[in-house]
UniProtKB/Swiss-Prot annotation:
Keyword RNA-binding belongs to the record: yes
NCBIfam families from the UniProt entry: rplB_bact (TIGR01171)
Compositional bias of kind Basic and acidic residues: 29-43
Protein name: Large ribosomal subunit protein uL2
Task of the protein: One of the primary rRNA binding proteins. Required for association of the 30S and 50S subunits to form the 70S ribosome, for tRNA binding and peptide bond formation. It has been suggested to have peptidyltransferase activity; this is somewhat controversial. Makes several contacts with the 16S rRNA in the 70S ribosome.
Family the UniProt entry places it in: Belongs to the universal ribosomal protein uL2 family.
Organism of this sequence: Thermosynechococcus vestitus (strain NIES-2133 / IAM M-273 / BP-1)
Phylogenetic classification of the source organism: Bacteria, Bacillati, Cyanobacteriota, Cyanophyceae, Acaryochloridales
SUPFAM superfamilies: Nucleic acid-binding proteins, Translation proteins SH3-like domain
Basic residues composition-biased segments: 210-221, 272-288
Subunit (UniProt): Part of the 50S ribosomal subunit. Forms a bridge to the 30S subunit in the 70S ribosome.
GO molecular function: rRNA binding; structural constituent of ribosome; transferase activity
């Protein structure tokens, strides 16, 4: 994938960059693998906003992606197309299985149409093949990783993401995740060889507010410019300070650096090293 840069012939195009979509081979999805996508606009069943700054966006259909590769064990499949998916940054690949079934999977980097892949404990270590973690050699890059065997992949699914197999001991396999966290997984958990495609997704510059609106993202208003009835940071004359020991959410809970993880979370036993710390305070400590 490459990034296309434009000449600044309008203000909205000056900072704009887009993917060149070089890996895409068709612009029409497999109709049997799509369904309607109802946009809930961040509301619950009562119409109350539960997730702020959501709403609008371009109409789209949801592509049904197969995250449980182990459900098609020992059945070879040929990569038919690589397609754009409006619901995620990663591309998706359409597989034609030898038994006649069609399924979408996340498109691994460098996987091209015509390649034959398979999910099997005895599959070769090649990009696109899925194997149990216990069968994957140390140092191999993987993605689309299961947390619970047979439940389907839940980790390492974002565009450009990959984890690395760093150790094996008994029934557990140690992976280094994209966040820097080192974590234990059951050796029966399936993972796909390689890195998720569209690795340049993080380098795309939207260039204007309208492109965020196309994605269904609404403006983010700072609490300090609200009225006190709307946010604890609001009110005062001019640019007033927060007036509290630290920043809080609209509901008065501490935020920006405040730890919210449960102290007795069961998965703590599987985490060898916590992820890298992110410093949100450094990017303007009053944005809640």
């Amino acid at each position: 994938m490459g990034i296309r840069v434009y000449r600044p012939y309008t203000p909205g195009v000056r900072q704009k960059t887009v993917s060149d979509f070089a890996e895409i081979t068709t612009d029409k999805p497999e109709k049997s693998l799509t369904r309607g996508f109802k946009r809930d606009k961040g509301r619950n069943n009562r119409g109350v906003i539960t997730s702020r700054r959501r709403g609008g966006g371009h109409k789209r259909r949801y592509r049904i992606v197969d995250f449980r590769r182990s459900s098609k064990l020992n059945i070879p499949a040929k990569v038919a197309t690589v397609e754009y998916d409006p619901n995620r940054n990663a591309r998706i690949a359409l597989l034609h299985y030898r038994d006649g079934e069609k399924r979408y999977i996340l498109h691994p980097r460098d996987l091209t149409p015509g390649t034959e892949i398979i999910a099997s404990p005895d599959a070769p270590i090649e990009v696109g093949n899925a194997l149990p973690l216990g069968k994957i050699p140390l140092g191999t890059s993987v993605h689309n990783v299961e947390i619970t065997p047979g439940r389907g992949a839940q980790m390492v699914r974002a565009a450009g993401a990959m984890a690395q197999v760093v150790a094996k001991e008994g029934d557990m396999v140690t992976l280094k995740l994209p966040s820097g966290e080192v974590r234990l997984f059951r050796k029966e958990c399936y993972a796909t060889i390689g890195q998720v495609g569209n690795v340049e997704a993080n380098n795309i510059s939207l260039g204007k507010a309208g492109r965020n609106r196309w994605k269904g993202r609404r403006p983010k208003v700072r609490g300090s410019v609200m009225n006190p009835v709307d946010h604890p940071h609001g009110g005062g004359e001019g640019r007033a300070p927060i007036g509290r020991p630290g920043p809080v959410t609209p509901w008065g809970k501490p935020t920006l650096g405040y730890k919210t993880r449960k102290k007795k979370k069961l998965s703590d036993a599987l985490i060898v090293r916590r992820r890298k710390k992110s410093s949100k305070r450094g990017r303007g400590g009053r944005q809640s």
